C-alpha cells in the first residue's frame, strides 16, 4: 500500500467503505495478542495446512498474454521503473527486463519515504530523468503496486487521474473501443465528461 510501514500492510475499512474510526481500530487492536500463540516453525508446507500459490507468475503470464511486450522491447524507448521499494519490483523485472530499475530492493520501512507515487515523493526519480537526459518515460508504483505515477522524458509528472484520461482517450480513439467506462469513486470526474 501507499501507507506507512507502521500499518504493516493492513487497511481496515468500515461498512460504508471508508476508514474505521479510531475507536473501532482500538477495539480491534485490543483483541490482538501481544505474542503469537501458534508456533509457525512447526507447520510444514507439506502438511497440506498451507497451499502455496505463485500469484506473481500468474500475473506475469497474464500480462505477457495480453500485451505486446515484444513491441515495447523493440520500440527503442528508454524506460525507467521506480518500485518505491514495493512489491511491484519483481514482476516488472520479469515483464520488461530491459527497463532501468531504481528503488527495486526490499526495504520494509521504504527508507523512510512514503511509498505513494506522487510528485513530492518522487523527487529522486525526477532528478534521475533530468540528469540522464535520454529517458523517454518513467513509471512509479506504490508499495503494493496498485497506484501509479508517470513522468515524461522532460521530467514532468503525470498523475494517475491524467493517466486514466489518456488511457480512455487511447482506447476510444486508437483501439476503437466503445461501451461503458467503470471507475472508482476516487477517479477524476473528467472521465465521465470524456465518456459522454
Predicted regions, residues:
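Short Gly/Thr/Asp-enriched flexible loops that form oxyanion-binding sites at enzyme active sites
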Residues: 5-15, 91, 146-165, 191-194
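Short, high-confidence coil segments that cap the C-terminus of an alpha-helix
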Residues: 133-135, 177-178
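Hydrophobic "anchor" residues on beta-strands that sit immediately upstream
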Residues: 78, 138, 180
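Proline/glycine-rich low-complexity loops and linkers
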Residues: 26, 30-60, 154-196
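Generic beta-strand/beta-sheet core signal
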Residues: 82, 102, 140-142, 151-153, ...
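Acidic, glycine-rich active-site loops and adjacent beta-strand->loop/helix elements
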Residues: 3, 105-106, 143-146, 185-191
Amino acid at each position: 500500500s501507499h501507507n506507512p510501514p507502521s500499518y504493516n500492510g493492513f487497511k481496515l475499512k468500515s461498512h460504508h467503505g471508508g476508514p474505521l474510526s479510531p475507536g473501532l481500530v482500538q477495539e480491534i487492536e485490543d483483541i490482538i495478542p501481544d505474542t503469537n500463540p501458534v508456533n509457525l516453525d512447526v507447520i510444514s508446507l507439506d502438511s497440506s495446512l498451507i497451499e502455496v500459490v505463485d500469484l506473481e507468475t500468474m500475473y506475469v503470464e497474464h500480462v505477457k498474454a495480453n500485451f505486446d511486450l515484444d513491441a515495447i522491447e523493440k520500440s527503442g524507448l528508454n524506460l525507467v521503473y521506480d518500485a518505491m521499494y514495493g512489491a511491484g519490483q519483481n514482476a516488472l523485472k520479469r515483464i520488461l527486463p530491459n527497463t532501468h530499475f531504481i528503488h527495486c530492493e526490499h526495504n520494509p520501512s521504504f527508507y523512510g519515504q512514503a511509498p505513494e507515487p506522487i510528485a513530492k515523493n518522487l523527487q529522486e526519480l525526477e532528478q534521475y530523468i533530468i540528469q540522464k537526459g535520454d529517458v523517454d518515460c518513467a513509471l512509479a508504483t506504490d508499495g503494493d503496486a496498485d497506484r501509479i505515477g508517470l513522468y515524461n522524458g522532460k521530467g514532468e509528472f503525470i498523475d494517475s487521474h491524467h493517466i486514466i484520461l489518456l488511457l480512455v482517450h487511447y482506447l476510444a480513439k486508437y483501439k476503437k473501443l466503445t461501451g461503458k467506462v467503470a471507475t472508482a469513486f476516487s477517479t477524476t470526474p473528467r472521465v465521465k465528461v470524456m465518456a459522454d
